[in-house]
């Protein structure tokens, strides 16, 4: 314990030396984060670390009113949807400039979307466009009508399309001129229309943004916004206490009393639209989505690199679910700042199936299921453990240790596999894991955000998978597809409830917890509004 405290002190002292004077300057805000960004291209990322930075650099056609999931205009001033739901015309905001001084217009919108779906586009080669394929494959094309009007033509009606256009991932508008200048390195030099402009990125240390004085919404109150990487939450809190940073994410729940009793700090907390899970690689994915963002019917299912025969068996996956005491994890690791999960969507979302009974913590039944599956003595398996804290999982190593202990009790020996964050994501998207810790924070407020990204077989393409269990139940895919063909919420809810029933039976995930959002700020920081989707918008923030 003494050595751990000493290392935390050393880390904090190093931080103070490296950033001395930054926090004391007027209008400079330093936010402590658990990990670095992977890329700064909204079309080509799936991680929240990257998105936290880009929330302040880029903008979408539509967005949410602060603190809600109520849709409002953003770079689009208005829009019209055809009666059959297959065409959407957006009327764009005029007088908006990119950070490089070029105009935001219809050409920029067509470019930002076209590079993701048009394989003949010269910029298509620079990305994997994973979330386009997962959520936006219904878009056939985006066409320019005039300089400030664009039309989205859909292949099929999609009830979630407008909410999907709020999520920053895949749909934020980038500067075509900047993309042409930097080509495959554009993700290192982001250029949007947002309230802050990119200045520098020192890998694994910090990203600096500065106020966009020509921002169409008015200049931000902050002069500079710095995202400082401090992986250890105790070190982040110490840095906040001594004034080297003004805000931080993912505090240790055990430090809440310390935070609440410090008059120089304030804790912001709200329910999280998230799920933390352990994905069990069921063994089969497919090579790539077609131009519609879906798997062709004749595309074969092939073994993933992490194929492991025991995990392909339903009874084994059910046994794993029964061997893990999730309530203990919530009580002792989340320390009551989360609720135990039994389904893959939060309880307040459309279609949540509360009638499902969670797998009980039952070691004897788990052992019996393993024996029935042909593994009475268990087996050895690897678990990928995230190197960073997330909104849905505050302390992945501790959760991994708990799972390791629980599964050992039924004869399953778990070996940890740890990588840097960027490599971790690449390997689980490629299906190299046997089991992995991950999760999702909803970006759109729509249940489809969870269903199409996490649970749909169409999202199990090896190399870009967001369905990290590589779960390939075709009935589930059909139900998710049907849910997007109607605007009737009751009908959509029934489809989602059925999906949850099927997934519960097949058990490709261990759903662990729905965590609260927890952020800590200096008491001198004002007007930060927690987003239900965990977005990090610092535009309105000011410091006394």
Per-segment meaning from a language model:
Residues 21-24, 64-67, 86, 93-123, ...:
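Extracytoplasmic/periplasmic ligand-capture domains
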Residues 519-544:
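Long beta-strand-rich cores associated with HINT superfamily self-processing modules
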Residues 91, 128-177:
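Surface-exposed binding/hinge segments that line
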Residues 176-177, 336-356, 518-523:
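Mature extracytoplasmic/periplasmic domains
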Residues 32-83, 114, 191-192:
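N-terminal lobe/hinge region of extracytoplasmic solute-binding protein
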Residues 1-9:
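Bacterial N-terminal signal peptides that target proteins for export
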Residues 512:
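Active-site-proximal polar cores
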Residues 9-18:
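Bacterial N-terminal signal peptides
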């Amino acid at each position: 314990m003494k050595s751990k405290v000493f290392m935390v002190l050393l880390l904090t002292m190093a931080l103070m030396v490296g950033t001395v004077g930054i926090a004391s300057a007027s209008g400079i805000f330093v936010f402590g984060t658990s990990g670095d960004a992977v890329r700064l291209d909204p079309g080509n990322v799936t991680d929240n670390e990257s998105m936290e930075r880009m929330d302040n650099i880029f903008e979408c056609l539509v967005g949410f009113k602060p603190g809600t999931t109520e849709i409002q205009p953003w770079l689009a001033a208005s829009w019209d949807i055809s009666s059959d739901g297959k065409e959407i015309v957006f009327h764009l905001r005029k007088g908006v400039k990119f950070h490089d001084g070029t105009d935001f217009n219809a050409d920029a919108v067509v470019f930002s979307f076209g590079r993701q779906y048009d394989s003949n586009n010269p910029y298509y080669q620079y990305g994997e466009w994973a979330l386009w394929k997962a959520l936006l494959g219904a878009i056939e094309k985006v066409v320019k009508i005039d300089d400030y009007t664009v039309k989205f033509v859909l292949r099929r009606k999609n009830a979630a399309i407008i909410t999907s256009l709020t999520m920053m991932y895949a749909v934020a508008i980038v500067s075509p001129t900047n993309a042409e200048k930097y080509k495959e390195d554009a993700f290192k030099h982001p250029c949007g229309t947002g309230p802050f402009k990119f200045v520098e990125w020192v890998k694994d240390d910090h990203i600096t943004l500065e106020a966009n004085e020509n921002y169409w919404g008015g200049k931000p109150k902050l002069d500079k916004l710095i995202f400082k990487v401090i992986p250890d939450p105790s070190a982040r809190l110490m840095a906040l206490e001594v004034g080297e940073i003004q805000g931080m994410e993912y505090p240790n729940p055990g430090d809440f009393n310390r935070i609440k009793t410090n008059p120089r700090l304030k804790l912001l907390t709200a329910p999280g639209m998230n799920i933390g899970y352990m994905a069990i690689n069921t063994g089969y994915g497919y090579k790539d989505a077609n131009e519609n963002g879906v798997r062709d019917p004749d595309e074969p299912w092939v073994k993933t690199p992490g194929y492991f025969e025991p995990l392909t068996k339903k009874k084994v996956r059910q046994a794993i679910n029964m061997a893990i005491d999730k309530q203990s994890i919530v009580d002792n690791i989340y320390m009551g700042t989360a609720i135990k999960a039994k389904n893959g969507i939060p309880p307040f979302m459309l279609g949540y199936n509360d009638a499902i009974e969670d797998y009980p913590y039952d070691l004897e039944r788990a052992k019996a299921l393993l024996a029935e599956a042909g593994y009475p003595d268990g087996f050895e398996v690897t678990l990928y453990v995230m190197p960073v804290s997330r909104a849905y999982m505050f302390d992945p190593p501790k959760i991994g240790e708990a799972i390791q202990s629980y599964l050992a009790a039924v004869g399953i020996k778990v070996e940890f596999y740890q990588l840097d964050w960027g490599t971790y994501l690449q390997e689980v998207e490629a299906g190299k894991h046997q089991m992995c810790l991950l999760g999702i924070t909803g970006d759109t407020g729509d249940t489809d955000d969870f269903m199409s990204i996490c649970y749909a077989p169409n999202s199990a393409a090896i190399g870009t998978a967001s369905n990290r269990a590589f779960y390939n139940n075709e009935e589930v895919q059909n139900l998710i597809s049907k849910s997007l063909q109607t605007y009737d919420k009751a009908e959509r809810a029934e489809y989602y409830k059925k999906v949850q029933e099927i997934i519960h039976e097949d058990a490709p995930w261990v759903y662990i917890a729905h965590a609260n959002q927890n952020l800590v700020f200096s008491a001198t920081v004002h007007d930060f509004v927690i987003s239900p989707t965990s977005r990090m918008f610092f535009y309105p923030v000011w410091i006394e």
